[in-house]
UniProtKB/Swiss-Prot annotation:
Residues 769-771 are lumenal. Residues 675-701, 830-864 are annotated as: Disordered. It comes from Neosartorya fischeri (strain ATCC 1020 / DSM 3700 / CBS 544.65 / FGSC A1164 / JCM 1740 / NRRL 181 / WB 181). This is Protein sey1. Belongs to the TRAFAC class dynamin-like GTPase superfamily. GB1/RHD3 GTPase family. RHD3 subfamily. Residues 49-305 form the GB1/RHD3-type G domain. GTP binds at residues 59-66.
Length: 864
């Protein structure tokens, strides 16, 4: 490749060797190369941040600009052949300093890092002729991007206007003022470094400096200045340095030595406040001062340069602050996207897992979430700050706030999901733990303190929730305050504790109600069984006074009240361990009294069913009819007053029917004070407390029943029907008694004994006269009596039956043996067997003495 013009297509590969001669930034057709960022990346300039420097070179065409850059920076820009005079550099080219890191005699004097050199197309070339548009645009581009502008000028051109590129420098001054007008808050300062070529030393360098500075002052005075800048000086915007180089062809060794010496000037330096360019004092130190840098990060330079050139080539007013903001906007967006990709890799798995748990309705506390949230947020902010803080501060701060907002929005959602999961799982675990502890206490039978269990589990639940919250929050963020969530959690724990307490009290009430039901079932049942005991019948108590039948309901009511009072004491004592409020205890006792009345009424209705009541009435009647006042059973005789006893017993029993038909106390002849005993509905009772309670007449006004109606046990129709049925049953008992009395009159007639004596007189005398008969009769009588007293008649009879059976079997066996031993018998057996084979065969079962098939048990009995 001989000339730079051939390099316009370079930069499409990722091979670093493709950029050996640099990269064409802008071609001769004013097109910007989009591969600048790729070149900077291959040269490892992109991550440098602000640690890079940009130099541009100006000068007339064919004055050795590319040659100068190649010697200064080791670049490989193509140079003009000595045998012809034509344009070599087309457009603007850029290359990185190749001498970076070279050893020097003085280690402190080394070239700056990441120096980028732009070789600008020469001016006053015949190829463009009168077209100076590109010259102006390239000058504006170089001034907007470069820190140092090298003006390549020959010694003999100093003092000339065209030859010394005074027109180009005038353009540079005008462009600089244009940039200043767009950004009055910042003075865009640059260094104009005049490299005087073919310097022979006849004219001292200071004189050349003076001439050039006079020309610069004249040029500055000649340009039109905006209002307020009329008195400004060129030194307000530019610094100047000068250097003379020997002739390359005539003094090649000196030229190489001086260019090497000059290259060491391209290092970072500091302004010397003691020097004043107006007095002709110019620094010979490092050329890269901090104020020259355009403060465009290396990773955004390509985008920034493209935006600058786009405005220049479209003849728009160049607005560097706007371009910097646009660049900052673009780069911050890119950095934000890159940062969010890394953030997503860390956070998305947790978001997906949390979302899946929410869909399944199975809240799960995610382990490691807090550490991942803190780490990913810190990395995202730090990485963004590292890459984006070099750009426009306003844009950076705005985009950082946007990044933090995006990150915090998602992290806040994760935190809320984590706290919700901890909330729900904590509530479930709390309920299960309380229930498990209660069941364990019930199984052990040692008792348990429900309030203590709840308090302990509440402390554990809150501690666990706070552990999850503290391990998940991100310190330093406003959304990491979980006090509200903790308050809601504590409130629901209190609600659940109250619900569990109410459920436990409800279970306690159920246990007490079952105890009341059992006690009332026994006690009231005994009272009903004692009906009629006033006559000392079957239901009478063994000792003590006989209860009066008319006080039956008094006894039932007293038993009921005492039982319920005992149950209330049990309920109150147990409820105290639940930490229940007085209102809850009042509601529980009120429900207990209502439920207990329902139990009593159900027991009464059970005892007062038609069948049970009729049986009780009959027993009461029979106690009075069949037994006397001393409780001795009556043996009816024809002389007894059966009708009178029957009438008194029946009428006495009939008085029980109206007594039992209505629940009334004997003392007051009025229903018991059920309404006062139950009491009014507590103000703290909820509809749920009342929904399972049956209405009670005289207590619940909406029921529409009075207390008298509530105490009605038997209706009038039932009473009449019961009376009729009882009378029929009593009549049956009376008829039976009558028959018994009449049956007792039957006896053997007296003449029968006389007839027996007359007919059996001879036999009686024979027995009495014969001692043997008499003794035998006496022995048999004594033996029979002894056998009866010893209860041996059964075994004797069984032994007799067994002996007779055995004798029968033995007789059959002997008969068969006898028949088989004689000829006649054998013929008979043969005939019997033949007839049996020719006809049907039947199997005969061995029967017991009762005519049933004999079993193994019968055989065992036979063996006995």
């Amino acid at each position: 490749m001989a000339t730079n013009g051939h390099f316009a297509t370079i930069g499409v590969d990722n091979d670093k060797t493709a950029y050996e001669h640099g990269v064409q930034v802008i071609d001769e057709n004013k097109e910007f190369n989009p591969n600048i960022s790729k070149y900077l990346s291959l040269e490892n300039v992109t991550p440098a941040g602000f640690n890079y420097h940009l130099i541009s070179v100006f000068g007339s065409q064919s004055t050795g600009k590319s040659t100068l850059l190649n010697h200064l920076f080791g670049t490989h820009f193509s140079v003009m052949s000595d045998s012809e005079r034509r344009q070599t550099t087309k457009g603007i080219w850029m290359s990185k300093n190749k001498k970076e890191g070279e050893a020097t005699v003085d280690p402190t004097l080394r070239m700056a890092d990441n120096i980028l050199v732009m070789d600008v197309e020469g001016t006053d070339g015949r190829e463009r002729g009168e077209d100076q548009d590109f010259e102006r645009k390239s000058a504006l581009f170089a001034l907007a991007t470069s820190e140092v502008l090298i003006v390549n000028i020959w010694e003999h051109q100093v003092g000339l206007y065209q030859g010394a590129n005074m027109g180009l420098l005038k353009t540079v001054f005008e462009v600089n003022l244009q940039l200043f007008l767009k950004d009055k808050n910042t003075t865009h300062r640059s260094l104009l470094f005049f490299v005087i070529r073919d310097f022979v030393g006849a004219t001292p360098l200071k004189n050349l400096q003076k001439t050039l500075m006079e020309d610069m002052a004249r040029l500055w005075e000649s340009i039109s200045k905006p209002p307020g800048l009329e008195s400004s000086s060129v030194h307000d915007y530019f610094d100047f340095q000068f250097y003379g180089l020997p002739h390359k062809s005539y003094q090649p060794e000196q030229f190489v030595a001086e260019t090497k010496k000059l290259s060491l000037r391209f290092r970072e330096g500091q302004r010397d406040p003691s020097m004043d360019a107006r007095r002709g004092e110019f620094s010979e130190g490092g050329v890269f001062l901090p104020e020259y840098h355009r403060r465009i990060p290396a990773d955004g330079f390509s985008r920034y340069a493209e935006g600058i050139w786009d405005q220049i080539v479209n003849n728009k007013d160049l607005d560097l602050p706007t371009q910097q903001e646009l660049l900052a906007q673009f780069r911050c967006d890119e950095i934000l996207r890159e940062v969010m990709i890394a953030f997503d890799e860390a956070i998305v798995p947790f978001e997906e897992k949390q979302s899946q748990s929410a869909r399944l309705g199975e809240p799960e506390v995610l382990g490691g979430l807090g550490a991942a949230m803190r780490s990913s947020r810190a990395k995202a902010v730090k990485n963004f700050e590292t890459e984006a803080s070099r750009y426009h501060k306003g844009v950076y701060q705005r985009k950082r706030a946007e990044l933090e907002s995006k990150v915090d929005t998602r992290l806040k959602a994760l935190l809320q999901g984590q706290l919700n999961a901890a909330h729900k799982s904590g509530i479930n675990e709390f309920s299960e733990a309380v229930s498990s502890s209660v069941k364990s206490g019930q199984k052990q039978g040692t008792g348990y303190d429900f309030a203590e269990i709840v308090n302990e589990e509440v402390k554990k639940a809150i501690a666990k929730f706070e552990d999850v919250a503290r391990s998940t929050v991100v310190e330093g963020t406003t959304w990491s305050d979980y006090k509200q969530e903790l308050a809601l959690y504590e409130k629901e724990l209190a609600d659940v504790s109250g619900r569990l307490r109410r459920e436990e009290m409800r279970r306690l009430a159920n246990r007490v109600e079952r105890w009341v039901q059992s006690r009332l079932g026994e006690s009231v049942g005994l009272e009903f069984n004692a009906l009629g005991s006033g006559r000392a019948g079957g239901g009478a108590p063994e000792t003590g006074e006989k209860p009066l039948e008319k006080a039956f309901w008094d006894r039932v009511w007293n038993v009921f009240v005492e039982t319920v009072l005992d149950a209330e004491r049990r309920f109150t004592d147990r409820a105290s361990s639940f930490d229940a409020s007085l209102e809850e205890v009042d509601v529980g006792l009120w429900r207990l009294r209502r439920k207990s009345w329902g139990v009593l009424r159900a027991k009464i209705d059970e005892e007062m069913t038609e069948g049970n009541l009729l049986l009780k009435l009959r027993e009461n009647f029979e106690d009075k009819f069949r037994y006397d006042d001393a409780g001795v059973p009556r043996i009816w005789r024809p002389t007894d007053d059966i009708e009178g006893i029957y009438t008194r017993a029946r009428e006495s029993t009939l008085t029980l029917i109206p007594l039992l038909s209505r629940f009334r106390l004997a003392e007051t002849s009025a229903p018991p004070p059920l309404d006062r005993w139950i009491g009014h509905t507590p103000s703290s009772a909820t509809p749920a407390d009342e929904e399972d309670l049956p209405p009670i007449g005289g207590v619940d006004e909406e029921e529409g029943k009075s207390l008298d109606e509530e105490m009605m046990i038997l209706s009038e129709a039932k009473r009449q029907e019961l009376t009729v049925r009882f009378k029929k049953a009593a009549d049956g008992v009376y008829v039976e008694a009558k028959r018994s009395a009449i049956g007792g009159m039957t006896q053997v007639p007296l003449y029968f004994y006389g007839l027996l004596l007359a007919l059996g007189w001879n036999e009686i005398i024979a027995v009495l006269r014969n001692p043997a008969y008499f003794f035998l009769l006496f022995v048999c009588a004594v033996g029979a009596y002894v056998t009866y007293q010893l209860n041996l008649w059964g075994p004797i009879i069984k032994m007799t039956e067994a002996a007779s059976s055995q004798a029968l079997v033995e007789g059959k066996k002997r008969l068969r043996e006898f028949l088989e031993s004689s000829d006649t018998g054998r013929q008979a057996i043969a005939m019997s067997a033949g007839s049996g084979r020719s006809g049907e065969q039947y199997e005969l079962s061995d029967l017991s003495k009762k005519g049933k098939a004999r079993t193994s048990a019968d055989e065992d009995m036979d063996d006995l």
